[in-house]
């Protein structure tokens, strides 16, 4: 057994897989079970009662986590003229148009999120096949295609998380770092779940939130008490 496998096994022993944990206890266990030498990300997986194969059951959106993500988010903006200046003033790391498209076509992806003004989407569309698979394509549904450039940049810098349900009906999203205090992780978790509840499709029938689990990057998953989570949002 490798050293990593031994550490994971030891971390797993801290968890009772037959039970669901209240939010506070789950966060405590996740922090205790983290064993990597780096500051692990805390991830949440939510299984929803939807079938994303049907367009009317797609769940997609974004939420600004109240306590951020604990990392410097590199923001790229496709804009010209006054909106270019607005983006720079708001703290965007890269702003441009065709010049940025050319860099991306050459294999440059040194950014975490991309924003575009609506008039730039004709240009951005040229690299849709490069941005889309990486989750970087600007989209009006999550507020990254907008003329409100300053707000979009500031939200991204503050810890905006985009979410989209996968084929299996699961949404994955980060809610912070292991080094965060428990209240900060809890606040981010509740904000994410609340956003998912608000994004519930009208076509979704039956139980909507079926399972919530939390883990650190290298750690085992912990199942949360859904009732405890939803009672706090």
UniProtKB/Swiss-Prot annotation:
Q: Which InterPro entries match?
A: Ribosom_uL1_bac-type (IPR005878), Ribosomal_uL1 (IPR002143), Ribosomal_uL1-like (IPR023674), Ribosomal_uL1/biogenesis (IPR028364), Ribosomal_uL1_3-a/b-sand (IPR016095), Ribosomal_uL1_CS (IPR023673)
> Which terms are listed as keywords in the entry?
Repressor, Ribonucleoprotein, Ribosomal protein, RNA-binding, rRNA-binding, Translation regulation, tRNA-binding
Q: Name one GO molecular function term.
A: rRNA binding
Q: Which Pfam families match?
A: Ribosomal_L1
Gene3D superfamilies xref list: 3.30.190.20, 3.40.50.790
Give the UniProt entry's GO cellular component terms.
Answer: cytosolic large ribosomal subunit
List this protein's GO terms for biological process.
regulation of translation; translation
* CDD domains membership: Ribosomal_L1
Q: Which NCBIfam families match?
A: rplA_bact
Q: Subunit structure of this entry? A: Part of the 50S ribosomal subunit.
Q: What does this protein do?
A: Binds directly to 23S rRNA. The L1 stalk is quite mobile in the ribosome, and is involved in E site tRNA release. Protein L1 is also a translational repressor protein, it controls the translation of the L11 operon by binding to its mRNA.
The family this protein is said to belong to: Belongs to the universal ribosomal protein uL1 family.
Q: What is this protein called?
A: Large ribosomal subunit protein uL1
């Amino acid at each position: 057994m490798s050293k990593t496998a031994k550490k994971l096994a030891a971390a797993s022993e801290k968890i009772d897989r037959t039970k669901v944990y209240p939010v506070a206890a789950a966060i405590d266990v996740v922090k205790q079970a983290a064993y990597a030498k780096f500051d692990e990300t805390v991830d949440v997986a939510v299984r929803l009662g939807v079938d994303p194969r049907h367009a009317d059951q797609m769940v997609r959106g974004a939420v600004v986590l109240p306590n951020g993500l604990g990392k410097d988010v590199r923001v790229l903006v496709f804009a010209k003229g006054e909106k270019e200046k607005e983006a720079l003033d708001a703290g965007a790391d890269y702003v441009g148009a065709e010049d940025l498209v050319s860099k991306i076509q050459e294999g440059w992806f040194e950014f975490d999120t991309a924003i575009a003004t609506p008039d730039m989407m004709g240009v951005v569309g040229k690299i849709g096949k490069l941005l889309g698979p990486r989750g970087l394509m600007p989209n009006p549904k999550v507020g990254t295609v907008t003329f409100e450039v300053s707000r979009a940049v500031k939200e991204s810098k503050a810890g905006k998380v985009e979410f989209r349900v996968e084929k299996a009906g699961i949404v994955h999203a980060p809610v912070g770092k292991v080094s965060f205090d428990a209240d900060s992780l809890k606040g981010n978790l509740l904000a994410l779940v609340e956003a998912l509840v608000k994004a519930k499709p009208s076509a979704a029938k039956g139980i909507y939130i079926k399972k919530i689990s939390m883990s650190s990057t290298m750690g085992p998953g912990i199942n949360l008490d859904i009732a405890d989570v939803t009672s706090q949002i």
